[in-house]
């Protein structure tokens, strides 16, 4: 038992190292975390049911021995089945008889695994782009979060906490901005906005894949429609959706003849598929809508910098500022990427640590501005204006 717990802890530690990332906004968490976990776990459980137990059981003639029974079950599971209501006669023509074919259940675990991978791609792209920008945002968020966790209970005095932030996290963030600026960190906000656009597009694509997997000739919005059928008592025997009892045709070869046999099969997987697909239909709609709203929100923020500036001003208004530079000078020192970093700090850490970080960064801003590493051709006039104030 101890070895099993140790193995689980080791796996969790490995996952946490591989997927180090800020918490992100709601849409990001829904896409890259919650939905990925839902789809991955569903895929694993459903795939295991293909190999453990009997996903399909067919009613074979009495003269079939155990080998024939096993063959029929395996054949019908792999080849596919079709649905005909039990109160209707089977048509003689194969095309007419198999009109309502059931072909999805073999592929559902693999489709879910693919969807889980696709839902993580926007986060992967964002991590790749932020790595290209030269600034490790995840490490910065983690550093400030750890510092706040270690120091918030040591002293509850505002000035003491603020001094602690001025000594470590603020310098750390300013140094990160300085070093990244010397590389190519000019587009972090644009990169993040592009990742939210891809999240929204990807969510709708995944919703389309789900609807195509269970293409219904009766319903356009089959999620609410099938749920309505269940609430009204119209089960699979009436609608044909997720049927539990299906038909399967196979040929028995004999010398000089081929005999067609039709058997009834119990498709127990559809009991779970029905509930799971109804849940996923509504869930993916929810994720797609949230992702779309989030996408437009970040496009607006990209075009309008006042949101991040307003958040910072709100934090600065909560305490007296030691620095003599103006708000506009502070925003100019931060730059577009600095404003984005501060916005991400507020988003991931919450208002209290973000306010301490903002105020302390403002207090030591002039030291950063006057450092030789900060001065470049773009900012020399600005530095001169700071020194003359």
Curated annotation (Swiss-Prot):
GO terms for biological process: monoatomic ion transmembrane transport. It is found in: Cell membrane; Cell junction, Gap junction. Keywords: Cell junction, Cell membrane, Gap junction, Ion channel, Ion transport, Membrane, Transmembrane, Transmembrane helix, Transport. One of its GO terms (cellular component) is plasma membrane. It is a multi-pass membrane protein. Its main location: membrane. It holds the Pfam family Innexin. The keyword Transcription does not apply. It comes from the Eukaryota. The chain crosses the membrane at residues 36-56, 111-131, 190-210, 276-296. GO terms for molecular function: gap junction channel activity; gap junction hemi-channel activity. Belongs to the pannexin family. Structural component of the gap junctions. This is Innexin-6. The gene is inx-6.
């Amino acid at each position: 038992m101890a070895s099993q717990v140790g193995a689980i802890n080791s796996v969790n530690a490995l996952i946490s190292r591989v997927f180090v990332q800020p918490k992100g906004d709601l849409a990001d968490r829904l896409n890259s975390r919650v939905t990925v976990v839902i789809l991955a776990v569903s895929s694993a459980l459903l795939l295991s049911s293909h190999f453990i137990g009997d996903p399909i059981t067919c009613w074979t003639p009495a003269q079939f021995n155990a080998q024939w029974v096993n063959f029929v079950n395996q054949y019908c599971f792999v080849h596919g089945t079709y649905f005909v209501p039990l109160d209707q006669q089977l048509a003689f023509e194969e095309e007419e008889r198999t009109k309502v074919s059931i072909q999805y259940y073999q592929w559902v675990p693999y489709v879910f695994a693919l969807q889980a991978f696709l839902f993580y791609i926007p986060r992967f792209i964002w991590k790749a782009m932020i790595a290209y920008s030269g600034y490790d945002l995840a490490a910065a968020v983690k550093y400030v979060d750890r510092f706040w966790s270690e120091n918030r209970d040591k002293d509850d005095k505002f000035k003491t906490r603020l001094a602690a932030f001025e000594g470590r996290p603020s310098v750390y963030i300013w140094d990160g901005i300085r070093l990244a600026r010397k590389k190519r960190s000019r587009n972090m906000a644009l990169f993040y906005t592009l990742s939210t656009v891809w999240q929204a597009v990807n969510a709708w694509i995944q919703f389309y894949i789900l609807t195509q997997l269970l293409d219904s000739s009766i319903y356009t919005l089959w999620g609410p429609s099938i749920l309505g059928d269940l609430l009204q008592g119209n089960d699979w025997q009436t609608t044909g959706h997720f049927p539990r009892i299906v038909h399967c045709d196979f040929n028995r070869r004999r010398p000089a003849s081929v005999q067609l046999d039709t058997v009834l099969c119990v498709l127990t997987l559809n009991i779970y598929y029905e509930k799971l697909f109804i849940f996923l239909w509504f869930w993916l709609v929810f994720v797609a809508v949230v992702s779309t709203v989030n996408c437009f929100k970040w496009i607006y923020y990209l075009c309008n910098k006042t949101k991040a500036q307003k958040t910072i001003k709100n934090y600065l208004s909560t305490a007296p500022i030691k620095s003599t530079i103006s708000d506009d000078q502070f925003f100019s020192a931060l730059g577009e990427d600095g404003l984005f970093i501060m916005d991400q700090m507020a988003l991931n850490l919450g208002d209290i640590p973000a306010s301490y970080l903002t105020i302390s960064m403002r207090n030591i801003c002039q030291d950063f501005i006057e450092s030789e590493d900060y001065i470049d051709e773009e900012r020399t006039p600005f530095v001169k204006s700071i020194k003359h104030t």
